[in-house]
């Protein structure tokens, strides 16, 4: 997340703590419910974040994917695979959002 997104997330978490705890627990539960490994789960969520044009979501899942062992090549390829699905302009925006984090 960018600094602004991180501040916003923390503000929402402070204001709506019970709801955010439930959302975080749901995320953990669904990740633990099947055979998809952490790195692949983050790459899937990275693609989904880009599909809904969520810059903050892309930033977050780039960080999480890196923490789970993804390479920068895997990050970029995950988005490039979406070119025929969500379009070239969206993928180019996503690549710039990955670049924000890798700088």
Residue ranges: model-predicted function:
Residues 42-51, 81:
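Contiguous, well-ordered alpha-helical segments that form the cores/surfaces of helical PPI scaffolds
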């Amino acid at each position: 997340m960018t600094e602004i997104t991180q501040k916003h997330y923390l503000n929402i978490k402070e204001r709506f703590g019970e709801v955010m705890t439930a959302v975080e627990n749901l995320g953990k539960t669904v990740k633990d419910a099947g055979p998809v490994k952490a790195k692949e789960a983050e790459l899937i969520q990275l693609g989904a974040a880009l599909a809904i044009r969520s810059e903050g979501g892309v930033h977050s899942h780039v960080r999480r994917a890196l923490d789970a062992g993804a390479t920068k090549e895997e990050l970029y390829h995950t988005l490039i695979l979406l070119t025929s699905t969500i379009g070239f302009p969206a993928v180019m925006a996503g690549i710039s959002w990955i670049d924000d984090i890798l700088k």
